[in-house]
C-alpha cells in the first residue's frame, strides 16, 4: 500500500491525498460506508459503488468471525469473493464491539474472553489479528484506568506486529496494518500512544476511542494532539466518527479517513442529511412536500423521489424507505468529503448549513 500526500490546505491542517491498494485507488479525505456483515445494510454493492460513489467500505471482524465464521470465509476465498465487493475494504479489530459488550467480556493479558451475542458461546480474541486489537475505554474513564488500558493496548500492539511481520499475504493480496492510538481524553496519554505507534513504521495510523461519550471539543483536542505527532506521509483514520460536521472538523485537523454507521442507521430511522441542513423526514411538515429529496444530490434517489414519498415510506415502515434514505445519506457523505478536497472557504459555509434543522 502506498499513500501520496498531494495537497495541504494553507489555512488549516486539511490534506488531500491518494491511497494505492491492491484492490484499487482511494482519494482522500474519504468516508468509508460501514458494511458490518460484509454488506452496507439494505443497499446493493452496485449502488454503493456507482450511486454513492464509495471507493472503500468497512467490514467488522467481530461480526464476521461469529457469522458466517472463519471456515466459510476461507472456503469462499476471503471476504472480497464472498461478498463480491471488488474495491478496497478495511476490516476493523472488533475492539469497539468488545467495548460495547462489556457486560459479557473479560480482559486478560492474553486477549479478550467474551460470549457471543448470538448464542452465548465462549470465544477468545487475541492481538494477533487485523486491525491491531485494542481496548476502547469509555470517554469518562478515570485516569488510572485509562493508563492501565493503554498499557495493555500497547503490549497487544507489539504482539500484533510481531505476528503481522511473520504472516504472508492472504489470498495473494497485500494487507496493511494500522496501529490504533488510544489514551481516552488525557492529552499526555494520547501523546504517549501516538509516539509509541510511530516506532512501527506502519502503512497508516488509526485514532480510536473517541466519540464514546466525551464532549465534542475534547474529541477535537485529542485529534489535534495525536495528529501533531503522527507522520505526515501516512494516512490517518478516525474510527467511528461521525456527524457531517464532525467529519469536516476532523478533516480540518488533518484526518484522512472516516467511518460511521450514522448515515445508514439514522437514515433508517428518518434522519436525512442534505446540502441545506438535516431533515427528520417523519415530521408531518414533509407530508405534502413534493420537492426532490436533495436537488444538489448525486444519487438517482435524490432526484427521482420526493420528500413526501419518502415521508410516506418511512411512516409506513416500508423497506424501500430505509433503502432510499440510506443510499441518499451515504452519497451525501461521499459528496461531502469529495468537495472537501478544496477545503477552507467551502468548509465554513457548509458547517453553517449542516447545523440547520429543517
Regions found by a protein language model. Name each.
Residues 1-170, 284-287:
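Non-catalytic, usually N-terminal nucleic-acid engagement modules in DNA/RNA processing proteins
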Residues 151, 163, 167, 172-293:
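Glycine-rich phosphate/ribose-binding loops and adjacent secondary-structure elements
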Residues 1-18, 26-32, 41-42, 136-142, ...:
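C-terminal extensions of enzymes
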Residues 69-76, 267-281, 334, 343-348:
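C-terminal helical cap(s) of enzyme catalytic domains, especially alpha/beta-barrels
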Residues 24, 153-160, 197, 226, ...:
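Hydrophobic alpha-helical packing residues
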Residues 158, 162-165, 228-231, 315, ...:
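Generic secondary-structure signature for well-ordered alpha-helical cores
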Amino acid at each position: 500500500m502506498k499513500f501520496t500526500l498531494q495537497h495541504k490546505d494553507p489555512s488549516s491542517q486539511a490534506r488531500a491525498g491518494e491511497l494505492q491498494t491492491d484492490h484499487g485507488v482511494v482519494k482522500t479525505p474519504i468516508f468509508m460506508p460501514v458494511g458490518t456483515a460484509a454488506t452496507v445494510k439494505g443497499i446493493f454493492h452496485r449502488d454503493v459503488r456507482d450511486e454513492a460513489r464509495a471507493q472503500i467500505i468497512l467490514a467488522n471482524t467481530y461480526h464476521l468471525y461469529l457469522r458466517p465464521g472463519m471456515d466459510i470465509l476461507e472456503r469462499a476465498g476471503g471476504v472480497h469473493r464472498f461478498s463480491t465487493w471488488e474495491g478496497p475494504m478495511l476490516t476493523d479489530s472488533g475492539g469497539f464491539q468488545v467495548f460495547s459488550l462489556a457486560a459479557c467480556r473479560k480482559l486478560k493479558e492474553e486477549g479478550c474472553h467474551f460470549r457471543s451475542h448470538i448464542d452465548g458461546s465462549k470465544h477468545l480474541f487475541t492481538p494477533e489479528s487485523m486491525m491491531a486489537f485494542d481496548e476502547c475505554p469509555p470517554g469518562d474513564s478515570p485516569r488510572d484506568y485509562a493508563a492501565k488500558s493503554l498499557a495493555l493496548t500497547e503490549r497487544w500492539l507489539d504482539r500484533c506486529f510481531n505476528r503481522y511481520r511473520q504472516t504472508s499475504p492472504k489470498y495473494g493480496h497485500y494487507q496493511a496494518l494500522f496501529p490504533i492510538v488510544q489514551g481516552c481524553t488525557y492529552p499526555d496519554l494520547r501523546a504517549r500512544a501516538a509516539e509509541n505507534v510511530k516506532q512501527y513504521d506502519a502503512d497508516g495510523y488509526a485514532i480510536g476511542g473517541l466519540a464514546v461519550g466525551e464532549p465534542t471539543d475534547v474529541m477535537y483536542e485529542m485529534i489535534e494532539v495525536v495528529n501533531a505527532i503522527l507522520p505526515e506521509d501516512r494516512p490517518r483514520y478516525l474510527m467511528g466518527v461521525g456527524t457531517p460536521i464532525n467529519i469536516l472538523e476532523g478533516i480540518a485537523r488533518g484526518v484522512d479517513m472516516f467511518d460511521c454507521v450514522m448515515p445508514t442507521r439514522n437514515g433508517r430511522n428518518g434522519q436525512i442529511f442534505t446540502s441545506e441542513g438535516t431533515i427528520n423526514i417523519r415530521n408531518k411538515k414533509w407530508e405534502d412536500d413534493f420537492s426532490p429529496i436533495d436537488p444538489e444530490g448525486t444519487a438517482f434517489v435524490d432526484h427521482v423521489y420526493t420528500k413526501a414519498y419518502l415521508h410516506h415510506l418511512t411512516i409506513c415502515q416500508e423497506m424501500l424507505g430505509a433503502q432510499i434514505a440510506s443510499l441518499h445519506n451515504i452519497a451525501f457523505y461521499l459528496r461531502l468529503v469529495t468537495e472537501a478536497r478544496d477545503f477552507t472557504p467551502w468548509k465554513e459555509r457548509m458547517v453553517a448549513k449542516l447545523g440547520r434543522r429543517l
